[in-house]
Amino acid sequence: MATSVDNRHYPRLNPAINGVVRSFKPPPIPSPRHQNKTVSFLTEKVIVKETKNDAVDDSYDSSDDEDESHNRNVSYYKEMIRKSHSDVEPSILDSRDESTADNWIHRNSSMVRLTGKHPFNAEPPLPRLMHHGFITPVPLHYVRNHGTVPKADWSEWTVEITGLVKRPAKFTMEELISEFPSREFPVTLVCAGNRRKEQNMVKQTIGFNWGSAGVSTSLWKGVPLSEILGRCGIYSRRGGGLNVCFEGAEDLPGGGGSKYGTSIKKEMAMDPARDIILAYMQNGELLTPDHGFPVRIIVPGFIGGRMVKWLKRIIVTPQESDSYYHYKDNRVLPSLVDAELANAEAWWYKPEYIINELNINSVITTPGHQEILPINAFTTQKPYTLKGYAYSGGGKKVTRVEVTLDGGDTWSVCDLDHQEKPNKYGKFWCWCFWSLDVEVLDLLSAKDVAVRAWDESFNTQPDKLIWNLMGMMNNCWFRIKTNVCKPHKGEIGIVFEHPTRPGNQSGGWMAKERQLEISSESNPILKKSVSSPFMNTSAKMYSMSEVRKHNSVESAWIIVHGHIYDCTRFLKDHPGGSDSILINAGTDCTEEFEAIHSDKAKKLLEDYRIGELITTGYDSSPNVSVHGGSTAVSLLAPIKELAPSKNIALVNPREKVPVTLIEKTSISHDVRRFRFALPSEDQQLGLPVGKHIFLCANINDKLCLRAYTPTSTVDAVGHIDLVVKVYFKDVHPRFPNGGLMSQHLDSLPIGSVLNIKGPLGHIEYLGKGNFMVTGKPKFAKKLAMLAGGPGITPIYQVIQSILSDPEDETEMFVVYANRTEDDILVREELEGWANKHKDRLKVWYVVEIAKEGWNYSTGFITEPVLREHVPEGLEGESLALACGPPPMIQFALQPNLEKMGYNVKEDLLIF
C-alpha cells in the first residue's frame, strides 16, 4: 500500500505502535479457483495492469464457481460497445464550455444541457439514447455534476479508508487493481430527478428540468467494496461501524463549502449480493472526467446520488454522512412540505425520507415527440409498434409492462426484452425494453397512450403525479397525447406529444395545458369557453431564425418559456437599463430571466408577448444547433464592436467570463471584500465607469444572477474587487432567508470559480462632467450623489474615476443613507478622499439609528438634508446620481429634488 493513515477523529480505535499505524498486507493465499494473470489496457495514456489476488479476509470472500455468471455476457456487451463506437461522433471541446473551468473536457455536442453552461448537467436526446440500445455509449451517458470537474492524475490518486476500521490505509490506483479482484458487469444508472420536468409543469420544485433520458446503462468494472472493507477490518455494529461514508474530491459551495458526500448502511456495503464496486472502467475504457475519473462508487439498484464520483475517502462511522449534500439532496418529502417548512421544521434530517433504491418506472420512447404517423392505405395495413424502457430498483426484476389506450380502463401486456442475466443472488441491475403492436386505427381513436410497469414485488406506477419539493422519483404513468393533423394535402395523420422536453426546451402537452390554465385563470371569458387543451389560437408562430434577427435597439425580441416577447418599447423604461435586455435580444433567455426577476416582473412581461416559438419543422438558418440548449453560444446573434486596444475580459456582453476567488477579507461582521482573478493576469475588466456586471452562480441547482459594481479601479490588471454586504438569514424579520447570493459568496472557499457577464447599465461616465445616458449625452459641473446601503458602489466608482483625473473639475456632493453607522460601506475610502480633495468632494451621512456622539444626520433623507448638502437643480449645471432601495428613490429623493429645481425625468440618473 502506498500510505497508511491514522484515525485522527476516532481516538477509541486501536492505538498506533510507536506513533505509526501499520499497513496490513497479508501474504498471498494459494487458491485453485483463481490463477494470477496480468492484463494491460492502454487507455488515455494510462496502462492498467490488473492482477487477480486472493489475499482478502476470508470472512468476506464472495468468490465461488458461480462468479463466472457475472462475466457470462461480457463479450456480448463489448461487441455492442464496439459497434456503437462507429455510430457516435467524436467528443469535442464545446464552445459552451470555453468560459468555464471545464473548458478542458471533451463532450458530445448533442447532449441536452439542463443547467446552462455550468456546471455540466445533461441528458442525451431520447431518440439517440434508444438508438444505441442496451449499452449506452459513454459520450451519451447522462451527467450529473454539482460543480467543476476535478483534474485528476492516475499516478497520484489515492483512496483513503479510515474511521472505524482496524487497519486504516490509503490505496493508489495501481494497488486497488492489483491487490483486489475486479468484477465487470452492466448496471443502469438513473438520476433520482429523472422525469422531474413533469413535476415542474404542475408546480415548480427546487430542482432543474430533467426529461425522461436521465438514465443510461454501462459495462462497469471495479473492485468490490466489501473486499476492501474486509481487508481493512471494518468494525462490527457493536463496535460502532454502522455507516460507510463516501467523499469526493470536488470543492462545492453547499453548507458553507464542502465536498460531495453521502453514505449507505454497513450491511449494504458488506453485502456481496449488492455488487457494490469502486469502478475504474466504463465500457472497457478508463472513466472519463465527467463520470468520475479515476475512480467512483457504483451501487447497483440505487439512485445515482449515492454513487460518489472522483472518490477520495471512505469513512466508517456510527452516524450517517454529515455532508450537506447527503441531507439537502435526494429526499422525497411529503407533498405538503415546501422549502420554507422544510427548513423551519428540519424535514431534511428525517431519515424516513431519504432515497436509496430506485422505484419502478417506465417510459414510452416510440413514438417520439412530434412524430407524425400518416393514416393511409399503406400504414393501416400493419400494426404500429410502441416501444420504451422500464427499470426498477434494489435488484428487482421488471416482470410486466402494460399499455392503455383508454385512460386505464383496459390494459395490454407488452413483450419484454431483458438483455442481462441475473447475478448469482438473482439480482437484476439493468433496464429492460418493452414493445407492443397496436392497430393504427386504435391509435387514431385514442386521446392518449399511457404505460406502467410492474416488478417482482408487484410494485407498480401510480396513475397521477405525486408532487414533492425536490421533484424526485417521479414515476406516474408516462402519457403521450395524440392529435389529428394534416401532414400532406388530402391526408390526415396522428401527431404524438410527449409530456415535456428536457431543460429549457419548449414543447410538450403539459406545457400547453399549463399555459392554458394560466390564461384561463387570468381571463374569465376564456375560462368559460375553453373546451380542449389543443384548441386553435390566434397566437402568431415564429421560427428561431426569425427571432435571431431581432437583436438590436431597433427591435429587441426575447424568448421565455417558448413565448416570444417584443421588448423594444420597454428598453427605455427597464429598471436595469437597456443593456440587460439587449445582451439577450434574439435569444432564448429563459434561465437568465427566471434567475433575476420577481413574480411581478413576470406578469408585466405578458404585455409584450407577440407570439410563440415554432418547436417543430426545420429552421432555415444555416448554422442551427441540433443539440438542444438554445442558450448555446452558436445561436447568439453577432455583436458589432471595435477590436479592443487592450486585453480586456468583457469583450462580448453576451458571454460569461470565469473568475476565480483569490482573496476574501472581512471588513465587518457582515461586509466582505472579495477579490476575483480574471482569466489572464494581463487582463483588465473593461467595464466602463457607471456600468455594472452580473455575477452568475449555480445555487441549489438553479442559476442565480445579481448585479454588482466593482470597487477596484477601472485600470486594475488581473483582478476585480467586490465589496458585498452579506444578508444573513434570520436577521431581518422581513427577509428570514437572507440574501441568496451574498450568503453564497460568503460560503465560497478560495479557488472557487464563478462567472461574470457585462457590461450592463444605461449610464456611462465619460469624464470631465460628461455622461452618456441611454445613448443621450448629458453634462454637469456639480453632481448630487445619493446612495442607500450597498447602492454606494456605483457612486463610489464615479467618484474614483473623477478623482483619478486631475483635469476633471467636477464637484461632488455625497449624501449616503444607512440603517446604522456600522452599515456604512467604504467609509474609510470616502472620508480619505473627502479630506484630500476638499474642494471637489463633500460627504454627508444619514443613519436611521445613531450612537451617542454621532455628528451627522439621524433619521431619513429629507428636504432639509438635501438643501443643506447638495446643490440646487440648475439646467446644464447639476445632475443627481442615485442608487438605493426603491422607497428611498420614490419617497425621499424624487419629490424633494423636484422641489429643489431638478427635472427628475431628465436630471435624476438612477443606476
UniProtKB/Swiss-Prot annotation:
This is Nitrate reductase [NADH], clone PBNBR1412. InterPro entries: Cbr1-like_FAD-bd_dom, Cyt_B5-like_heme/steroid-bd, Cyt_B5-like_heme/steroid_sf, Cyt_B5_heme-BS, FAD-bd_FR_type, Flavoprot_Pyr_Nucl_cyt_Rdtase, FNR_nucleotide-bd, Ig_E-set. Its cofactor is FAD; heme; Mo-molybdopterin. Pfam families: Cyt-b5, FAD_binding_6, Mo-co_dimer, NAD_binding_1, Oxidored_molyb. Residues 56-68 have a biased composition (Acidic residues). Homodimer. Residues 539-614 form the Cytochrome b5 heme-binding domain. Mo-molybdopterin binds at residue 191. Heme binds at residues 574, 597. GO terms for biological process: nitrate assimilation; nitric oxide biosynthetic process. Belongs to the nitrate reductase family. Nitrate reductase is a key enzyme involved in the first step of nitrate assimilation in plants, fungi and bacteria. FAD binds at residues 706-709, 723-728, 735, 740-742, 793. Binds 1 FAD. Binds 1 heme group. The heme group is called cytochrome b-557. Residues 654-766 form the FAD-binding FR-type domain. It comes from Brassica napus (Rape). GO terms for molecular function: FAD binding; heme binding; molybdenum ion binding; molybdopterin cofactor binding; nitrate reductase (NADH) activity; nitrate reductase (NADPH) activity. It is an enzyme of class 1 (oxidoreductase). Residues 53-72 are annotated as: Disordered. Its EC number is 1.7.1.1. Keywords: Disulfide bond, FAD, Flavoprotein, Heme, Iron, Metal-binding, Molybdenum, NAD, Nitrate assimilation, Oxidoreductase. It catalyses: nitrite + NAD(+) + H2O = nitrate + NADH + H(+). The gene is NIA2.
